[in-house]
């Protein structure tokens, strides 16, 4: 269904209304039928409100099929239509506190509640408050306690029969609990997918090389509307009941909160995040309380729902057009919005990670004006096919960094430009590289790069590195921001007068830091290597490097093959070490530390090579708990026989020795077809009798 023609101005109400109807119907089709929404909720709401206003001002422009006259959507051709016994209507929306106050006043007026001389309601209305789930509305039909049919909302009057798919959702009971069950019960509720289940589903999709879902709502809708119910059964769907259609053969509870309590006794899942409150103040208190906890909830919501609690008062208020007068959906500020992508820059993180950042035309989303949004990495830009000049959907949820969700492809201009990852760091000019099997590109500037400076200095001073006591993050911030320190070597040039001039840095603190810097000049080779902050090189690897080579220069000049001979150094770590020392900036800083800083450590000859044994040239991995040997004892025995004991399984692994509770290493070995031995098999191997 193609996007509507050129947008007419507001000065032409007839054409504008026709365009709005066409645009909303197109969005409805994409949302309900194709399950491929391309218009953010906030944009849809804005267009809908505008159409309502035009039709209110020009009643002659109202058409029977206008989106304002119905709920929206139509049955897909692959499902049998189901006419609802009672329409599944949508709710009127509120976006601001004032909308809620006005709703409460309308309800109070409609119920003839008492007011004082100032017009303030003195007899507050009682409301039931619930969450507004971001899923798919469903009607469940039970006859004499047995589940017989399920249907989607559709256009509110006619939906789609999804009975077989709904049967696969374990949260939905096929038989209700209790003895006096109604002859017929029409339960209204929402099918949704929890955040954790959504993440796992997308992991499975990626592993299978299949398309990932954009969000939990799309995943739930796409899963429910499968023609093959086996596919639905494989999807982690959930359900919450929140309303009622038709009830026959039982008394209707007097209140909405009572209805939900009754549902729980029947075994239907009902969300516990609900409350009964009085008046507008109670409604707003519930809204703001939920808003504060929204991001920590295990599922997506886009607002809360208020309903007059008493059933008799609901009946008195009745319905207007497409929605009940007794209810309101109070929506949170839009988390998604449309805007234009002006440019794509790259940002250098504190660890050298290169992140593409979208520069946007300002847009208000998630309660704030957004001008920049993350694009995560180069692969994400390619996967989403995002280009400079595109109209894009931007998402901002709570304190989460804004991100570009997708491009609106049918709005793409002819001159849209693809993103090209730069080859040099914009901060220091060093080479940008991306290691195999990694999604993140990184600056190789290391100790020299300004963007990485604070993190490099903080790591350099850590207790397990050079142990510079008194050099905390706040002091580092001042030193860098005042351009007093550019590299770790500059730390050893700091004088007393420079330090006491820093904010909140007393004379005693300055003397202590100078003493600490003096002590740090005398360290060990392993600590110095660790202090350099080489990616993938932790304390253990630093010790192995120092032990294997004995001094720093051979490490700096070692080819990758020589690095691979070091215990527990695999291809990725070896490549990282090699690239670090290949960068001239890093070598310069190291020379400054040795010369200007006078940082020293004992050096010696390389460690003697292990004697040639029955396992010379073999790589062995230990995993799990062995019956009689500790991990360290087994390692010593294997190394004494000439084996290299590695920490991870790869194609270069010759044997895996597995004990109890072996985990992913064992699975990886079986996947690669690597021989797996138990402790007895290891002893046989060491005796030279292995095959």
Swiss-Prot record:
Enzyme active site: 132 (n6-amp-lysine intermediate)
Cofactors that this protein relies on: Mg(2+); Mn(2+)
UniProt superkingdom: Bacteria
Entries under InterPro entries matching the protein: BRCT_dom (IPR001357), BRCT_dom_sf (IPR036420), DisA/LigA_HHH (IPR041663), DNA_ligase (IPR001679), DNA_ligase_AS (IPR018239), DNA_ligase_CS (IPR033136), DNAligase_adenylation (IPR013839), DNAligase_N (IPR013840)
GO-annotated cellular components: cytosol
Enzyme class, first EC level, given as a word: ligase
SMART domains in UniProt: BRCT, HhH1, LIGANc
Reactions catalysed: NAD(+) + (deoxyribonucleotide)n-3'-hydroxyl + 5'-phospho-(deoxyribonucleotide)m = (deoxyribonucleotide)n+m + AMP + beta-nicotinamide D-nucleotide
Keywords associated with the record: DNA damage, DNA repair, DNA replication, Ligase, Magnesium, Manganese, Metal-binding, NAD, Zinc
GO molecular function: DNA binding; DNA ligase (NAD+) activity; metal ion binding
BRCT domain: residues covered: 610-691
Residues annotated to bind NAD(+): 41-45, 90-91, 130, 153, 190, 307, 331
One GO BP: DNA repair
Residues the record lists as binding Zn(2+): 425, 428, 443, 449
EC number: 6.5.1.2
Family statement: Belongs to the NAD-dependent DNA ligase family. LigA subfamily.
Entry function: DNA ligase that catalyzes the formation of phosphodiester linkages between 5'-phosphoryl and 3'-hydroxyl groups in double-stranded DNA using NAD as a coenzyme and as the energy source for the reaction. It is essential for DNA replication and repair of damaged DNA.
Protein name: DNA ligase
Species assigned in the record: Burkholderia pseudomallei (strain 668)
């Amino acid at each position: 269904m193609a996007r509507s023609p050129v947008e007419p101005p507001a000065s032409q109400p007839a054409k504008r209304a026709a365009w709005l109807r066409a645009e909303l119907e197109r969005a409805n089709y994409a949302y309900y039928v194709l399950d491929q929404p391309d218009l953010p909720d906030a944009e849809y709401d804005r267009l809908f409100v505008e159409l309502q206003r035009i039709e209110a001002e020009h009643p002659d422009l109202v058409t029977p099929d206008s989106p304002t006259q119905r709920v929206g959507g139509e049955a897909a051709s692959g499902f049998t239509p189901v006419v609802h016994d009672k329409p599944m209507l949508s709710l009127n929306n509120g976006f601001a506190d004032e909308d809620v106050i006005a709703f409460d006043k309308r309800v109070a007026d409609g119920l003839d509640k008492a007011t004082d001389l100032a017009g303030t309601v003195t007899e507050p209305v009682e409301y039931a408050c619930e969450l507004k789930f971001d899923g798919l509305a469903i009607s469940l039909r039970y006859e004499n306690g047995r589940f017989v049919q399920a249907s989607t909302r559709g256009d509110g009057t006619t939906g789609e029969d999804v009975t077989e798919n709904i049967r696969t959702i374990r949260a939905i009971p096929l038989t209700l609990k209790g003895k006096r069950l109604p002859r017929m019960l029409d339960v209204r509720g929402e099918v949704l997918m929890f955040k954790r289940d959504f993440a796992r589903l997308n992991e499975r999709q990626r592993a299978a090389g299949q398309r990932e879902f954009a969000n939990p709502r799309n995943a739930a809708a796409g899963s429910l509307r499968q023609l093959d119910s086996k596919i639905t059964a494989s999807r982690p769907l959930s359900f919450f009941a929140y309303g009622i259609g038709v009830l026959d053969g039982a008394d209707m509870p007097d209140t909405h909160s009572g209805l939900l309590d009754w549902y729980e006794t029947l075994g239907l899942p009902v969300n516990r995040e609900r409350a009964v409150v009085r008046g507008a103040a109670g409604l707003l208190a519930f809204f703001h309380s939920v808003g504060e906890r929204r991001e920590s909830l295990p599922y997506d919501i886009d607002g809360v729902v208020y309903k007059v609690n008493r059933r008799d008062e609901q009946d008195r208020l009745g319905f207007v057009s497409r929605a009940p007068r007794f209810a309101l959906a109070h929506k949170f500020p839009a988390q998604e919005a449309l805007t234009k992508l002006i440019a794509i820059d790259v940002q250098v993180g504190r660890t050298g990670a290169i992140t593409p950042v979208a520069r946007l035309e300002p847009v208000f989303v998630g309660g704030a004006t957004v001008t920049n949004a993350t694009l995560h990495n180069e692969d994400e830009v390619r996967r989403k096919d995002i280009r400079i000049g595109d109209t894009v959907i931007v998402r901002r949820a709570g304190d989460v960094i804004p991100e570009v969700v997708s491009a609106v492809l049918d709005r793409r201009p002819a001159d849209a430009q693809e993103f090209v990852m730069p080859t040099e760091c914009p901060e220091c000019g060093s080479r940008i590289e991306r290691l195999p099997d990694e999604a993140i590109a990184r600056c190789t500037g290391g100790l020299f790069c300004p963007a990485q400076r604070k993190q490099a200095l903080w790591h350099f001073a850590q207790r397990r590195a050079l142990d510079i006591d008194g050099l905390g993050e706040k002091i580092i911030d001042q030193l860098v921001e005042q351009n007093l320190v550019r590299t770790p070597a500059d730390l050893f040039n700091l004088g007393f007068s420079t330090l006491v001039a820093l904010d909140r840095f007393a004379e005693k603190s300055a003397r202590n830091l100078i003493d600490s810097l003096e002590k740090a000049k005398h360290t060990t080779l392993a600590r110095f290597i660790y202090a350099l902050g080489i990616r993938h090189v932790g304390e253990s690897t630093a010790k192995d490097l120092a032990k294997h080579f004995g001094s720093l220069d051979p490490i700096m000049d070692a080819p990758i093959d020589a690095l691979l001979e070091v215990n527990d150094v695999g291809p990725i770590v070896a490549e990282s070490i090699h690239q670090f020392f290949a960068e001239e900036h890093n070598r310069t800083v190291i020379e400054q530390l040795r010369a200007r800083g006078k940082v020293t450590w004992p050096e010696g000859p390389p460690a003697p090579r292990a004697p040639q044994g029955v396992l010379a040239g073999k790589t062995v991995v230990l995993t799990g708990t062995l019956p009689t040997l500790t991990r360290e004892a087994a390692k010593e025995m294997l190394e004494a026989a000439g084996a290299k004991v590695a920490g991870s399984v790869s194609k270069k692994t010759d044997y895996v020795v597995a004990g109890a509770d072996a985990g992913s290493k064992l699975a990886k070995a079986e996947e690669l077809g690597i021989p797996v031995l138990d402790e007895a098999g290891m002893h046989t191997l060491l005796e030279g009798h292995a095959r």
